[in-house]
């Protein structure tokens, strides 16, 4: 038995199916199987909230968690996608723990951050970008705070994280080295030659898909209100640079750089880079918070009521096919017909 990704995301759905359906017959088979996926998605929202509450403020944290939870594509995948939702949640956990490592500088934070990477790696190989983000962020902090920065507090992370990841990997696979090679090879070629349609043009995954595919798809599948606040937040982060600002920017942009390599496969819209929806929501929340800081209390409440009511209505209109959501830039799902894939898992 072999899989081109870590086994951790497969265990909870199967266990839930065996317990809640086979053993006690409490739920239909599909519902029992999907409950852990929903929990993963909710945990991802909760992690984003806690992280931003500690790093920025509670209001921004609340805005971000609502943006994420009411993003149609995330909401849809949360009910069906057993790989990419757990991967996104684990990615968020790692970003929060890296932030805690830098801010608290304790041995326990170092160990927990390394263990979190092990868990993320054993969910999906997308997690290889976590230490890349960590390295870039630590380098920034070193350059900006050379006098107070102590490399000995952070360098061990880059040794412990891969060691812990491989030890956990070893537990699950009889041929851990061969399986590791299989995972990395599949990361690049697992979707080769699958047809991909983008704006009415046909491409082949792993060879001809353009580098801008992820950015294009994020623009057309993110609700316009979130997209607008994201742009405001992006400008705010660039104007007011702080360590947490750099971390959010790295979290959003670095994982997408892999698509500059034409041989990296991508299909099914945003699901292969779902981890960037969390920093996108965070940056949008910063933009909303920034806008509200200029508004009177009454106007601020009206803005919030309009924004979140619109998102909630969108979720309701598309239910249960939120995976097929496209925004007004392409004319919604109707305008996307013949130009984009409208369905994959669960639709």
Regions found by a protein language model. Name each.
Residues 5, 11-12, 119, 135-262, ...:
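Transmembrane-lumen/periplasm boundary regions of multi-pass, lipid-linked membrane glycan transferases
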């Amino acid at each position: 038995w072999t899989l081109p990704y870590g086994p951790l995301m497969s265990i909870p759905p199967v266990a839930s199916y065996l317990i809640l359906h086979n053993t006690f017959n409490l739920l239909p088979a599909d519902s029992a199987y999907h409950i852990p996926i929903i929990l993963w998605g909710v945990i991802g929202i909760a992690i984003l909230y806690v992280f931003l509450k500690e790093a920025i403020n509670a209001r921004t944290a609340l805005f971000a968690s609502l943006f994420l939870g009411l993003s149609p594509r995330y909401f849809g995948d949360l009910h069906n996608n057993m790989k990419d939702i757990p991967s996104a949640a684990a990615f968020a956990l790692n970003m929060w723990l890296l932030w805690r490592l830098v801010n608290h500088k304790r041995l326990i934070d170092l160990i927990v951050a390394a263990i979190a990477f092990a868990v993320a790696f054993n969910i999906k190989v997308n997690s290889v970008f976590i230490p890349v983000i960590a390295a870039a962020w630590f380098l920034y902090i070193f350059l900006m705070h050379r006098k107070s920065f102590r490399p000995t507090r952070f360098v061990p992370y880059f040794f412990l994280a891969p060691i812990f990841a491989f030890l956990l990997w070893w537990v699950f696979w009889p041929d851990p080295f061969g399986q590791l090679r299989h995972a990395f090879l599949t990361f690049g070629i697992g979707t080769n030659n699958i047809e991909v349609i983008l704006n009415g043009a046909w491409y082949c995954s792993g060879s001809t898909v353009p580098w801008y595919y992820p950015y294009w798809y994020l623009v057309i599948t993110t609700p316009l209100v979130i997209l607008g606040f994201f742009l405001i937040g992006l400008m705010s982060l660039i104007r007011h640079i702080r360590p947490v600002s750099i971390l959010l920017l790295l979290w959003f942009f670095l994982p997408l750089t892999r698509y500059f390599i034409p041989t990296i496969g991508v299909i099914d819209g945003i699901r292969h880079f779902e981890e960037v929806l969390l920093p996108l929501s965070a940056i949008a929340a910063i933009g909303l918070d920034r806008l509200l800081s200029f508004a009177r209390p009454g106007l601020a409440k009206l803005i919030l009521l309009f924004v979140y009511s619109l998102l909630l209505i969108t979720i309701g209109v598309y239910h249960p096919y939120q995976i097929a959501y496209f925004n007004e830039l392409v004319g919604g799902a109707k305008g996307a017909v013949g130009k984009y894939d409208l369905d994959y898992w669960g639709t």
